[in-house]
Amino acid sequence: MSMPTYKVCCDKCDFQAWSYKLWGAKEYVDSKGEEIPLDTTFSWCNKCQSIEPIESFDNTATYVSKLHQSLAAIKADTNSIIKLFFTRLMSSVRVTDKYFLNEAQVYARKIEQDIKRKGTEKCLTCGSNNVELYAGDKSIGWHLVPEVDGENAFINIQHPNCGGEFYIPSKLNRIGMALERRIFSLDGLEIKNIENE
């Protein structure tokens, strides 16, 4: 299966970086073996001297909202004696509640991780924390698609050490490759890399 990818180029030098670096599942694993989602952004790593996948702790509000939704679902299933009786009686309802409880715990751990680690983001390629984050309206995400017909889309981000400006050529490419699952410690250091078929 192929997926669309784009490259980020510099208008002053021959620099190129490909968005497929963001592909594949990336997760933290804590000391108990529990998985926590790992969000990434495409930003500059001073050690790699390239645009690389960098940890992102900017989605905390989204996880807070998801946590509220999971807790609301649990509350809706347990807010009366009759519902509690049927929950006890019917295993399918217990499974659903257990799912929402597990989901809520994952979101709570992710929120804690985001708050604890914000400002200490690391490059997921080399492990360095000497990074320049492109966030907000200066973010380069995997979902970014230039909306320009036949022209390069300049993204208003300067190429460090060069002074050129990054742009995305209007032509998207499709690449087929095996996706990998990468596991990281809570400190952002890679533990293992698993290729998925």
Show which residues each predicted segment covers.
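Short recognition patches in nucleic-acid-associated and regulatory proteins
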Residues: 6-42, 47-103, 109-110, 117-156, ...
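Extended, charged low-complexity segments
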Residues: 161-165, 169-197
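His-enriched metal-coordination microenvironments in redox/metal-binding proteins
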Residues: 1-7, 197
